[in-house]
Amino acid sequence: MKKPQDSSFAVQRRSGHIESTRYWKLSPAEPMGADCAPYPQSTADREAIEEAAALLREGSTVAFPTETVYGLGADARSTAAVEAVFAAKGRPSDNPLIVHIAERSELDGLVTEVHPSAAALIDAFWPGPLTVVLPVLPGVLSPLVTAGLDTVGVRMPDHPLALALIRAAGCPVAAPSANRSGRPSPTLAAHVLEDLAGYIGGVLDGGAAGVGLESTVVQVQPDGTAAVLRPGGITAEQLAAVLGPGAVTSAPAPAVDVAAGAPGPSTDLAEAPAAASGYSPGAAHAAGDNSPAPRAPGMKYTHYAPRGALGVVRGASAQRVAEAAADLLQAAQRAGEITGLLLFEEHRALYPANAAACVVSLGSLASPEEGARSLYAALRRFDEAGATYILAEACPDTGLGLAIMNRLMKAAGGTVVDAG
């Protein structure tokens, strides 16, 4: 019998607790919505899933692919297991976790009620990239999962491998993104290993995540309206198509720090980009430590950030944005910075050929799905290039563009360059 491909990905001990992180390479599996076929199909894949599920049952942590990003899973009922997730990520304990289930019937054992509007959204978008915040059933989940709140975010992923793992584990799986806190979320198993090898029990490699951004998080109010706490793979327009016009509201946008009123070498971002270039896990935790626990992940802290300083450039036209960004990048290069530019393909010709040391495209503005799918990998590309000063073009904040801009603004810590 063919053994599952298990290289027992040996790494130097870094956490003091896990000397090696197990690694399984599985057959690719595509999301298929409600008609998702059973998985795994091969004996090798089935054995790998069972071994990973056994780790979860034993209280260990396993990274696995979903249609959004790779998640770091643990038994949501076990405080010790959930503590291991927080420790591996360096995640602040007041940041709640999303619970993943494989069957809708499992909701009955986790929450006290499901509002009819929430049920309508679940019917429309599960399995899929939608997390619904619901009143938690006391005493079932570890209190660390909910960060002491009386609600819990639950979703059913649209990925055969993820569903197979949850079913095999036989428990609700708490799973934030499988990266160090504050870093870009992982869309490949290689990203997980880059951040967490030696900190976690295992990684199931199922190929690239399809959506590329985390799930949309919504909370239905008593009047039936839905508040979007975090934009994601399901757009506000899609939610409104189910609940009706005017029934969807958004949480407040991240605070904005306008770094450049008029673009040029004299701006703060150009003068001292290195001030924010060093990544520190604690830096993402510093802001807002005394504020209440967020109702959903991604609401309180800096997230998704590359190691270099990042600013988002916006303006009245693509030409103005390109001119402002080019001026700032040239000034940064003269100051000795390694520069990066994140742009959309339609605007590439507006920049000089040597606009930055590392230029990465998010594809076409006409295909926001492509931009969403490649955003986190693009931010990691800048790290690979050693970029210390990065500028990213803004995009329209409609449809999926709202989620892209949410992630960019979080990654930039709210720093905006206003090109006028």
Where do the model's predicted regions map?
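Active-site-adjacent structural elements in enzyme catalytic cores
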Residues: K2-G420
